[in-house]
Curated annotation (Swiss-Prot):
Species lineage: Eukaryota, Fungi, Dikarya, Ascomycota, Saccharomycotina
EC number annotated for this UniProt entry: 2.7.11.1
Amino acids binding ATP: L105, G106, K107, G108, K109, F110, G111, K112, V113, K128
Naturally occurring in which organism (per UniProt): Yarrowia lipolytica (strain CLIB 122 / E 150) (Yeast)
Protein name as catalogued: Aurora kinase
Active site: D222
GO biological process: chromosome segregation; mitotic spindle organization; regulation of cytokinesis
Family stated for the protein in its record: Belongs to the protein kinase superfamily. Ser/Thr protein kinase family. Aurora subfamily.
Superkingdom assignment: Eukaryota
Region annotated Disordered, chain positions: 1-84
Length: 371
């Protein structure tokens, strides 16, 4: 795919240029709880940029149709009240010049993420910058497009927000929610493994995020510590939707994800459904408690593959009985018999440790809504 074809393919996710360096992007307002979280970021020292967010008070978003006479200067639908990110309704033209660029927050294969502040509103976010040339040469333009299409429509406490996106001649940019503590992977490497109290909080939150995604027929397919971010009060947010897929048919057969976390149906190239994420959550729980994935082998991918398909699972004796039970229920060879995420809040391991959590379960949690 050529550079021109990449730009054309991005048109469905609002990346068409109206002017040489400025394009229109859709911006999505934060929920009140999310705004409160980002307001607290002012306590974190970040060098050049203060992370104090502008004071904004607003009600839940309502969509209102724009009069035809105003279509030339406004979008077809606008938000009421104004978006806390833009300070204006509807769409806003953006270019890189609209941001103060702060420290680098992370680096990936195709670009970097920076702490940025909107010069007009003072709103702090994370800007993911990727070179178009590298996306094309890496043959990941479809993966990037998928990430934008999926993440633009997600609103959940435990899912990283994508506020908007734009591009210029050489790069594409994603305006993302700023999460103060960064990758959970780094914390796990520093601590070697988590306490059961901490791990149970994270696994519960992941189950809520996955329930939300599965309810929208989205399979993440790449659950791992590197794709989880840590915010205030032990709140985690799942990120990196490059391997995710919107799967209305509920059955797929594409090989993807990270080898240590892949379920047997994927490594054996069999059709799979949302239960692949349940398997990966079981792997994640094991790594949280033991410091490494359960089927990881020094012998390489083939050795790991053999252990996965044989379910060669060895749980250390220091893992509690109810934790081991949950791991085994998620790591079941038959996808249909794997643990149901909707029952996570009732599992004895979660019930026993929930009073010890720093994280406070919101009233919007799946089981709270159905109570």
């Amino acid at each position: 795919m050529s550079m021109k074809q990449l730009e054309t393919s991005m048109s469905s996710v609002s990346l068409q240029e109206k002017k040489p360096t400025r394009i229109k992007i859709a911006l999505h307002p934060q929920s009140k709880s999310e705004q409160n979280e980002t307001d607290r970021a002012s306590k974190i020292p970040t060098g050049r940029i203060s992370t104090t967010q502008p004071q904004t008070y607003y009600r839940p978003t309502n969509l209102t149709k724009t009069p035809a006479s105003q279509v030339s200067r406004r979008s077809s639908y606008t938000t009421d009240p104004p978006s806390p990110l833009t300070g204006i309704t509807g769409f806003r033209n953006y270019s890189l010049d609209d941001f103060e660029i702060g420290k680098a927050l992370g680096k990936g294969k195709f670009g970097k993420v920076y702490l940025v502040k909107d010069k007009k509103t003072g709103f702090v976010s994370a800007l993911k910058c990727m070179e178009k040339k590298e996306l094309v040469e890496g043959n990941v333009e479809k993966q990037f497009r998928r990430e934008v299409e999926i993440q633009s429509n997600l609103r959940h406490t435990n899912v990283l927000r994508l506020f908007g996106h734009f591009h210029d001649k050489d790069r594409v940019y994603l305006i993302l929610e700023y999460v103060v503590h960064g990758e959970l992977y780094k914390l796990l490497r520093n601590q070697k493994r988590f306490t059961e109290s901490t791990a149970s909080s994270y696994i519960y939150q992941m189950s809520e995020a996955l329930l939300y995604l599965h309810g929208k027929n989205i399979i993440h397919r790449d659950i791992k510590p590197e794709n989880i971010l840590l915010h205030f009060n032990d709140t985690i947010k799942i990120s990196d939707f490059g391997w995710s897929v919107h799967a209305p048919s509920n059955r797929r057969s594409t090989l993807c994800g990270t080898m240590d976390y892949l379920p047997p149906e994927i490594v054996q190239s069999r059709p799979y459904d949302k239960n692949v994420d349940v398997w990966s959550l079981g792997i994640l729980m094991y790594e949280f408690l033991c410091g490494a994935p359960p089927f990881e082998e020094p012998g390489g991918a083939q050795a790991t593959y053999r252990r996965i398909v044989k379910l060669d699972l060895r749980i250390p004796p220091y893992v509690s009985a109810d934790a081991a039970d949950l791991i085994k229920r998620m790591l079941t060879l038959d996808p249909a018999k794997r643990f149901k995420l909707k029952d996570m809040h009732k599992h004895p391991w979660i019930v026993r440790l929930r009073p010890t959590w720093k994280y406070k379960v919101p009233k919007t949690a799946s089981h709270e809504r159905s109570a």
